[in-house]
């Protein structure tokens, strides 16, 4: 009966990338298997960037993490696919990236490769790239400088000490994966974040027709705000500024914003402060004026000495909105 309930659970679409998205997926899959993760393919750094350059494929890293978060296999399989080589020509590369690269080699498209890897790992729900186009992410800073490439944006923004004015994709007419649009339209709940605002979440909104599908969908629309500001992207931002950036880049409406009101231990505040990162503040009244409800909850977790969202608490809140 439990599996039946999962299979017939609410239809949830999550949009983003990075570790924040995969963390949340681990919590959500305990409540429903009707999950679609729509993932950015703008990454051009690290092991993903190397494979993108060498093999001409779309970056596998964020998609790999989402697949592993939704997998139903032995823990050893996740350890294997997350393993990073420490020596030789493959140093820094993850086996999971190579697995997906090999799957891409025997498939007619990257979309099919992702589906095949998902089948092998008995994924609950589905993982979709937002586009199959070879897109590059660029950022224009307020001082007029244009940064070329996702991996360079945080570094050069910090160097220039000028806020991000807006980001954009090249080509500007990137076509969405049709199945992603269908699932957005059919969803009960659409969740943006958590994750890097400019390099994980907003790139998805820049793909043609994605914002329009979100707006036309009858789903509840939720933004999960980051707990801490991010150097190179959101220094000095409060939650309202995060949402303003989403609207600036095409999002048209939100129903809820989830913010953390849990107490962050002083030692972590101090350590993050050294990197110019601080807790994200929020103004409930300002959100009310925009017609957005604020959910203030303790969603804080400390994992491996890093501040993260607690996937269980977050999933309970998100599922509670559908009751």
From Swiss-Prot:
<dbReference type="InterPro" id="IPR002882">
    <property type="entry name" value="CofD"/>
</dbReference>
<comment type="similarity">
    <text>Belongs to the gluconeogenesis factor family.</text>
</comment>
<dbReference type="InterPro" id="IPR038136">
    <property type="entry name" value="CofD-like_dom_sf"/>
</dbReference>
<dbReference type="InterPro" id="IPR010119">
    <property type="entry name" value="Gluconeogen_factor"/>
</dbReference>
<dbReference type="GO" id="GO:0005737">
    <property type="term" value="C:cytoplasm"/>
</dbReference>
<protein>
    <recommendedName>
        <fullName>Putative gluconeogenesis factor</fullName>
    </recommendedName>
</protein>
<keyword id="KW-0963">Cytoplasm</keyword>
<dbReference type="GO" id="GO:0008360">
    <property type="term" value="P:regulation of cell shape"/>
</dbReference>
<comment type="function">
    <text>Required for morphogenesis under gluconeogenic growth conditions.</text>
</comment>
<dbReference type="GO" id="GO:0043743">
    <property type="term" value="F:LPPG:FO 2-phospho-L-lactate transferase activity"/>
</dbReference>
<dbReference type="Pfam" id="PF01933">
    <property type="entry name" value="CofD"/>
</dbReference>
């Amino acid at each position: 009966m439990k599996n039946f309930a999962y299979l017939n659970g609410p239809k949830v679409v999550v949009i983003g990338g990075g570790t924040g998205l995969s963390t949340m997926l681990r919590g959500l899959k305990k409540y429903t298997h009707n999950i679609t993760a729509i993932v950015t393919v703008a990454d051009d750094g690290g092991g993903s960037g190397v494979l993108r350059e060498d093999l001409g494929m779309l970056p596998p890293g964020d998609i790999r993490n989402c697949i592993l978060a939704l997998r139903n296999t032995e823990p050893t399989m996740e350890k294997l696919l997350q393993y990073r080589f420490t020596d030789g020509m493959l140093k820094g590369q993850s086996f999971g990236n190579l697995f997906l690269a090999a799957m891409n080699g025997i498939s007619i498209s990257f979309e099919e490769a992702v589906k095949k890897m998902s089948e092998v790992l008995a994924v609950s729900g589905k993982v979709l790239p937002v586009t199959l186009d070879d897109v590059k992410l660029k950022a224009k800073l307020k001082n007029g400088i244009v940064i070329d490439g996702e991996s360079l944006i945080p570094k050069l923004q910090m160097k220039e000490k000028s806020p991000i004015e807006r980001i954009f994709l090249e080509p500007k007419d990137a076509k969405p994966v049709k199945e992603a649009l269908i699932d957005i339209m059919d969803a009960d709940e659409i969740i943006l974040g958590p994750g890097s605002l400019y390099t994980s979440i907003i790139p998805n909104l820049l793909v043609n027709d994605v914002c329009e599908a979100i707006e036309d969908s009858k789903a509840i629309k939720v933004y999960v705000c980051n707990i801490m500001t991010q150097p190179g992207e959101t220094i000095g931002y409060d939650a309202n500024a995060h949402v303003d950036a989403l609207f600036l880049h095409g999002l048209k409406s939100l129903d809820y914003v989830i913010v953390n009101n849990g107490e962050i231990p002083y030692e972590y505040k101090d350590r993050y402060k050294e990197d110019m990162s601080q807790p994200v503040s929020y103004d409930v009244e300002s959100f009310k004026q925009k017609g957005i409800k604020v959910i203030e909850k303790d969603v804080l977790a400390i994992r491996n000495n890093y501040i993260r969202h607690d996937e269980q608490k977050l999933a309970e809140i998100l599922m509670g909105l559908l009751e």
